Amino acid sequence: MNQDAVAKALLGMAEALRTQDPPKLKMAIKCARSTLSMEISDEMKAICNLQLGKLLFFYTDNFELAKNHLQCAYDKMSAMGTFYTRDKMNAISMLADLHIHYQQWPLTSIKATIRHEITTTRGFPALSNKLMFQLIELMKIDKDVEGAIEMCQLAINSSHADPKMELYFRIAKTLVTYQLMHEEPDISDVTRIGSMIKVMENSTTSDKAHLECIKDFYVCTKLAYMFYEGKSRTSRQLLRQIQKSQTSGETKIHGIRWLGEPSITLLACVMNQICALVQSNTDRVEKYYHLVIKHADEIIFKSTRSPQEPGVVRCINMIKMTTLEMMACCNVLACRPQKTLHNVRDMLEWSNRTSGPLLTRYFTPHIHYILGLQCCYFRQHENAENHFRAAMKKLHKEDITAHNTMALLNLNLAITYLNQLKMADYYEVSENLTAPKISSCSQMLKNNVKLLSAFFAYITNKLNECKLLSHEVLDDSKAEDFFRLHGLGLLLLSLVTDVDEKGVRPTVDWSKKSHDHVVILFSHSLYEKILLAAGYDPKSELMKMVVSEQLASRRMLSVENLTPLVANMPASKLLQWFDGDPFKLLPRDETVL
C-alpha cells in the first residue's frame, strides 16, 4: 500500500471517529494530522490539509492553525485545475468565516482572493453566492461603504435568474445602508423589495418557507436599525410580525438560509426584551431574560455536538451577552446590586469561555459601563469615572457602533462630573457631545444629550433654556414611549415651571412598573407637593401611598441599604477593576454558569 492510500485510510478513520456517538474528536484530529507527516503527493497533501483544517475549524479554538491548513489547501488546489474547484471554494469560504468571526488578521488579502474567485469561478452558484455575502461582510468590517454597496449591486445583477437570492442581496444592501450610513435606504430599493416579495407570495411555484425566512431577514434588519435609533413605538408592528412568523418546528429549506427557526425565535425574544427595556418595563425584561438564557444555552449545548457555522454560534453568543447586559442595567435601576454583579460575572465568564476574542473585545467596555452605573448608586464617584474611562480606553474604535458607544460613555461621564459640580471636567467632556460630533449617533442618544444640556442649564441658572430643552425632551420621548426619559424631563421641568397632576400621574404609575427607584422617589415627591397644593388630606389613603412609596425608594437608594447587599460577594471586587485580568480578583472555583 502506497503512502497516499495510507493517508486516505487515515482520513477515513478520522471521519469514522468524528461521526461516532459520542464523537472522538481529539483522536480524529490526530489521525488527520498524522497524514501530513507522511511522504504523500501534492494532491493528497491538499486533501489532507483541507480535512484537518475543517476539523480544526469546526471543533477547536485553534483558529491560527485552522487558517494555516485551509490556506495551504486553497493554495495547492488553486494550481490543480477545475476538478478541485468545489473544495477550493469551500476552503476559501471557511477562511472568510475565520476572518469575519475572529478578526485577528488583516483583511486585504482575503478580500482580494474572494473577489478573484467570484469573478473567475463558474458552476457553483450556491458557493459563489455565499462568497459574495462574505465579501460584503468583510467590507462592512472594514467600514468600506462604497465597496460594500458596489458588491451588493454586483451580487444583485448576477442573481436575476434566482429571485430569492436577488432578494437576499437587495436586503443585504439595505443592511449596509443602516449599519454603515445610519440612514434609511433609498425608497426605490425598498419599493423593489416589497414588489418582489408580493410577486413571490402570489406565485404558486415559490418556496413559501424560504420566502418567510427571507421576510424575517428583512424585518429583523429594519428592526435592528429602529432599535438603534430608539424607535420603540414605531417598531411594534414589525415586532408583532416577526413574532407571528415563528412556527413550532424547523422547516426544510433548499438554498441559503439566513437563520434557523430556533435562532430567529431567540432573536425575536431579545428584540422584545430591548423594546421592554426602552419602555422601562423591568418585569417584561426579566421574563424574556429567563427565556433567552434557557434557549440560548440549549442551542449552544447542541452546537458542541453537531457543528454549526461560526456566524450562527456568534449570533447566539451575542444574544446571550446582550440579554445579560440588559438585565444588569435593570438591576442597577432597581437597586439590586447583588444581581447586577451576578450578571456581570456571567458576562465575564461567558466571554472568557467562548471561542474567539470578539465577545471579550466588544462587551468589555459594556461591562465597565454597567460597573460605572453601579458605582454611581454606591456614591463611589471616582470609581464610576474610572470605569467610564476604562470603557473608552478598551472600546474598539473600528466597531460599527463604536462612535455611538463612545458618545454614550462621554454622556455618562459628563453626568457624573455634573452631579459632583466638577465643572472644569464637565466642560472638557461635554466638548465631545456637541451637535456636530454626535450628528451620526442614534436619535435616542441625542435626546439624552438634550436632557443633560437641560440639567446643565438649570444648574447654571439658565432657566428659560432649561424650560425650552425640557419641553423638547418631553416631545421627543412621548413620540417613541421613552418613559424614563419622559419622566426625568418632566421632573426637571417641574423645577422651573408648574406641572399639574395630569402631567405627573403617568410617570408615577409607570415608575412602579419599572422598579426605577430614582424616578419613583422624585415623581412621588413631586406628586405629593401637587396633591397638598390641591388641598388633599395628608391622612388620605392616596397621600399615605405616595409617602410610603417615597420612603421605600429612599431606603432602597441609600448607601446604607445597598452596601451590605454585596459586602460578602467576591464579585464586589469588580467595582475596583479598571484594567488587567478581572479573574485575578475572583476565586477561580466560584461557578456561576
From Swiss-Prot:
Disruption phenotype: Chromosomal, neuroanatomical, guidance and egg-laying defects. Altering the activity of both the dorsal repellent slt-1 and mau-2 leads to the abnormal dorsal projection of the AVM axon. Migrating cells and axons are mispositioned along both the antero-posterior and dorsoventral body axes.
Superkingdom of origin: Eukaryota
Keyword Cell cycle part of the UniProt annotation: yes
Protein transport is among the record's keywords: no
Location relative to the cell: Nucleus, Nucleoplasm; Cytoplasm
Cellular component terms (Gene Ontology): axon; chromatin; cytoplasm; nucleoplasm; nucleus; SMC loading complex
Primary site of residence: nucleus
UniProtKB keywords: Cell cycle, Cell division, Chromosome partition, Cytoplasm, Developmental protein, Mitosis, Nucleus
GO process terms (BP): anterior/posterior axon guidance; cell division; chromosome segregation; dorsal/ventral axon guidance; egg-laying behavior; maintenance of mitotic sister chromatid cohesion
Similarity comment text for this entry: Belongs to the SCC4/mau-2 family.
PANTHER family: MAU2 CHROMATID COHESION FACTOR HOMOLOG
Function: Plays an important role in the loading of the cohesin complex on to DNA. Forms a heterodimeric complex (also known as cohesin loading complex) with scc-2/SCC2 which mediates the loading of the cohesin complex onto chromatin. Required for normal development until the fourth larval stage. Functions cell autonomously to guide migrations during the development of the nervous system. Participates in the guidance of mechanosensory neuron AVM by a slt-1-independent mechanism. Regulates chromosome segregation in early embryos.
Record protein name field: Maternal uncoordinated protein 2
Taxonomic source organism: Caenorhabditis elegans
Gene: mau-2
